[in-house]
A protein has these predicted regions:
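Auxiliary Fe-S-binding modules of radical SAM enzymes
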Residues: 1-43, 211, 233-347
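Conserved Radical SAM active-site core
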Residues: 27-66, 73-181, 185-193, 201-214
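Basic (Lys/Arg-enriched) interaction patch that binds polyanionic ligands
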Residues: 68-70, 225
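Hydrophobic anchor at the start of a short beta-strand
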Residues: 153, 219, 250
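Active-site glycine- and acidic-residue-rich loops that bind
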Residues: 160-163, 227-236
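Glycine-enriched alpha-helix->loop->beta-strand junction motifs that scaffold or abut catalytic
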Residues: 174-177, 218, 244-248
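Conserved strand-turn element in the central/C-terminal portion of the radical SAM core barrel
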Residues: 187-189, 195-198, 211-231, 254-257, ...
Length: 347
């Protein structure tokens, strides 16, 4: 597949072999066409995940969707689609499993007798404000449950659709129950359209952060992932733009290509930026000990070697210049009204 055959609107340019299946069919380049999204309703028995990773700052996460229409070529969550019998490639962004019973399951979780409330992260795996949310409103219904039970929630998204729920955020913020962060890995619109094709533009995300902050909502941003040779030269510019919105904090991660993310991303590079492919792959390996992936706790986010160190130093320059006196707002579970009373029963 040549660069002229890059499929617009898709991060993955093809499906890749499922690690758990013995056989697979890989189509020829000429067979691959843009695929329409298929929505699949699933019926989980539980909805809140206990986060046990020592390098993550949350104890619970909740994912209303499995798979993500945003189509980010680098997404670390792609391999999770293989557990459902799908591919981490095109399937991940075109076969979306939706959990319409998530709000009801969340209420059942809240009224457990021994539940101790702690901030729940939306989503942690796939984006809770991906395009289908505009129609289904599962995330909004989840927020309504959290407001009713006065339970704290932190949100991370790549979509300015978060503004739709500003009315709920304002009410939740009266009890210190909400924080909202947006991920902005590039200001280059051409790169964004190819790399994360169905996310909001950087301009729209920055405007959303500004509006949220004007309404006193705690906000933050992630520069994620930083990819040497693609967006690493934008870091200081992005930090400055984030600071101008009034955001309380920013964070970042370095790219890692674990498992089947690797063939998806490499094929994307080949079709989107063939002239940069070898350089980008080489730079990633230089900060990943000769590999493209990394699963070790803590190491997976910070990398190693001179390339990673240069990125870290640039980040610190930006932090000291633009975020010196800012910090993340700590949310409160002091007003939680779930397991103690069990009186609401929204469903």
């Amino acid at each position: 597949m040549s660069s002229q055959n890059h499929i617009k609107g898709q991060g993955a340019q093809r499906n890749v072999k499922n690690r758990f299946e013995q056989y697979s069919y890989e189509p020829e380049d000429w067979e691959i066409e843009k695929t329409n999204t298929q929505i699949i309703e699933v019926f989980p028995k539980t909805i809140v995940n206990v986060v046990k990773s020592p390098d993550l700052p949350m104890e619970y996460s909740l994912n209303p969707y499995q798979g993500c229409e945003h189509g980010c070529s680098y997404c670390y969550a792609r391999p999770t689609h293989e557990y459902w019998g799908f591919s981490a490639g095109i399937d991940f962004e075109r076969k979306i499993m939706v959990k319409k019973n998530a709000p009801e399951l969340l209420e059942k979780f809240f009224i457990k007798r021994n539940y101790i409330p702690k901030t729940i992260m939306l989503s942690g795996n796939t984006d809770c404000y991906q395009p289908i949310e505009r129609e289904l409103e599962i995330t909004r219904k989840i927020l309504e449950v959290c407001l009713a039970y006065r339970h704290p929630v932190s949100i991370l998204s790549k979509n300015a659709l978060v503004l739709r729920d500003l009315d709920l955020f304002i009410k939740m913020n009266e009890l210190n129950l909400i924080s909202v962060a947006l991920s902005i890995p590039t200001m280059n619109e051409d790169l964004r359209r190819k790399m994360e094709p169905r996310t909001s533009s950087a301009i729209k995300k920055l405007e959303a952060l500004k509006i949220l902050k004007e309404n006193n909502i705690p906000t933050g941003a992630m520069i994620a992932p930083i990819i040497p040779g693609l967006n690493s030269d934008e870091t200081l510019k992005i930090i400055k733009k984030i600071s101008e919105t009034g955001a309380d904090w920013f964070g970042y991660t370095l790219i890692r290509l674990n498992d089947t993310v690797e063939p998806v991303f490499v094929k994307w590079l080949e079709t989107s930026f063939p002239d940069r492919k070898d350089k980008v792959i080489s730079l990633i390996k230089q900060m990943r000990g000769g590999k493209l992936g990394e699963k070790r706790y803590f190491e997976r986010y910070k990398g190693e070697g001179s390339i990673a160190e240069m990125i870290h130093k640039t980040i610190e320059i930006g932090r000291n210049k633009y975020f010196r006196d800012r910090k993340m707002v700590e949310l409160s579970a002091a007003h939680f009204s779930g397991s103690k009373t069990q009186q609401l029963k929204l469903f």
